Amino acid sequence: MEDKELIYKIQHGNKELLEILIEKYYDDIYRFCYYKTGNSSLSYDLTQETFLKLIKYIGTYKHRGKFKSYLITIAMNVCNTYFDENKVELEELDDNQTYKENDSNELSRIEQ
């Protein structure tokens, strides 16, 4: 069954067909998330989040191109939201701050 027909039927009440759509694109979306994150566990979570959003908004989807592109857009937004919400704060050093002599000794010990 073509994506357009699947989506039409899902939008008109046949929610069981969501499983077919998810199975069809799951690996592609997982690979995309893994490409963006480099983390298998996180990619799994982001893939799940992508499909949860699809389930929530499938009723508003209008067929205007490849469905896979639509899913990739959702996945990209999910990944970007994750990165925005989980920024790592980096401590900036003042121009006058330098590393301590002890830091250098610690580095030498680690290298040996």
Roles of regions detected by a PLM:
Residues R31, D45-L52, K56, G65-N77:
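Structural recognition of an alpha-helix C-terminal capping motif at a helix-to-coil junction
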